[in-house]
From Swiss-Prot:
Residues 162-201, 202-241, 247-286, 287-326 form the Pentapeptide repeat domain. This is Secreted effector protein PipB2. InterPro entries: 5peptide_repeat (IPR001646), Pentapeptide-BTB/POZ_domain (IPR051082), PipB2_N (IPR048984). Keywords: Host membrane, Membrane, Repeat, Secreted, Virulence. It is found in: Secreted; Host membrane. Its main location: secreted. Effector proteins function to alter host cell physiology and promote bacterial survival in host tissues. Involved in the reorganization of late endosome/lysosome (LE/Lys) compartments in mammalian cells. Necessary and sufficient to link kinesin-1 onto the Salmonella-containing vacuole (SCV) membrane. Required for centrifugal extension of lysosomal glycoprotein-rich membrane tubules, known as Salmonella-induced filaments (Sifs), away from the SCV and toward the cell periphery. Required for virulence, but not for intracellular survival and replication in phagocytic cells. Pfam families: Pentapeptide, PipB2_N. Coiled coil: none annotated.
Length: 350
């Protein structure tokens, strides 16, 4: 019995003190020689049993929080009690009148026996908010609550049309998620992973995607006006018809992206890489592409009036039927064919 209490206390500490994949694996792995032997001969039976209990602990916590809090932004209760967890009582005592330790005290009890642990308040609150987020948007609870960086684990989540205005999604994992038509206006997505996500028609204006991963994402028709995409990874992303007015993409990796039909008026793409990018019928008036790497990029029927390509790499860059008036190309590196094209254009417009 004592070992059972210790095991459950360890699970509670891992789930609500860390919430990561590594913490889940550590908490659900066999602990004794006997458990390792049984686990081996049952082809992982001990681990499966522990994983089931771990998941039940998370789901019970989520339901308890949902039933005791008016919304996920409300203060957490000072005492959270989970009854009948495998015959045990699990209690979380937050700092307050009855707890001056500054940490969340976890107490697992059964009859006259108990086990106590402590977990950081900041981690506990972040994990509880993540559970409530899933409840609010009807997402099934996952045994991995947070990423290794401390963001929410929302991998593959279906959040179509969700209102995520000003949401904190820093370091979150939204890879493969479906956010079609969602509103992320002013959302903080710094360092988040949106690889392969569907962001078609999303409202991302004034949002922060600094150093975020948007590789292979589908962002057709999305609004990114005034968004911060500095240092973001947008390789192979589809940005067809996006509105990116005054968007900051400086230093972003946009290799092989498709920006056809996009509006990039006054967008800052300085130092960005757009090698092999496809840009057809886009509006890029007054766009800043200084020091950008545009090698083998293809500009077709695109308006580059007033764009700044100073010091850009234009080797083997294709410009076909483009508007090049007032274009700046000082110290740009370009192939002979590109230089000839610019010379012919300027001579025709003198």
């Amino acid at each position: 019995m004592q070992r059972s209490l210790d095991s459950l206390a360890g699970m509670a500490t891992s789930a609500f003190g860390a919430g990561t994949s590594a913490a889940m694996r550590q908490a659900t792995s066999p602990k004794t020689i006997l458990e390792y032997i049984i686990n081996f001969f049952t082809c992982g039976g001990i681990r499966r049993r522990n994983e089931t209990q771990y998941q039940e602990l998370i789901e019970t916590m989520a339901e308890t929080l949902k039933s005791t809090m008016p919304d996920r932004g409300a203060p957490l209760p000072e005492n959270i009690i989970l009854d009948d967890m495998d015959g045990c009582r699990v209690e979380f005592n937050l700092p307050g009148e009855n707890n001056e330790a500054g940490q969340v005290i976890v107490r697992v009890s059964k009859g006259d026996h108990s086990e106590t642990r402590e977990i950081p308040l900041v981690s506990f609150e972040k994990i509880c908010r993540a559970l409530l987020f899933r409840c609010e948007f009807s997402l099934p609870q996952d045994s991995v609550i947070l990423t290794a960086q401390g963001g929410m684990n929302l991998k593959g989540a279906v959040l179509t049309g969700a209102n995520l205005t000003a949401e904190n999604l820093c370091d979150a994992d939204l890879s493969g998620a479906n956010l079609e038509g969602a509103v992320l206006f002013m959302a903080d997505c710094e360092g988040a992973n949106f690889k392969g996500a569907n962001l078609s028609g999303t409202s991302l204006g004034d949002s922060n995607f600094k150093n975020a991963c948007l590789e292979d994402s589908i962002m057709c028709g999305a609004t990114l006006d005034h968004a911060n995409l500095t240092g973001a990874n947008l390789q192979h992303a589809s940005l067809l018809g996006c509105s990116m007015i005054e968007c900051n993409c400086s230093g972003a990796n946009m290799d092989h992206t498709n920006l056809s039909g996009a509006t990039l008026i006054r967008a800052d793409m300085s130092g960005a890489t757009l090698q092999g990018a496809t840009i057809m019928a886009a509006i890029m008036e007054d766009a800043v592409l200084t020091r950008a790497n545009l090698r083998k990029a293809s500009f077709i029927s695109t308006n580059l009036d007033g764009a700044d390509l100073a010091e850009a790499n234009l080797n083997n860059t294709c410009f076909k039927d483009c508007t090049l008036t007032h274009l700046r190309t000082e110290d740009a590196t370009m192939s002979t064919s590109t230089q000839t094209l610019f010379n012919e254009f300027y001579s025709e417009n003198i």
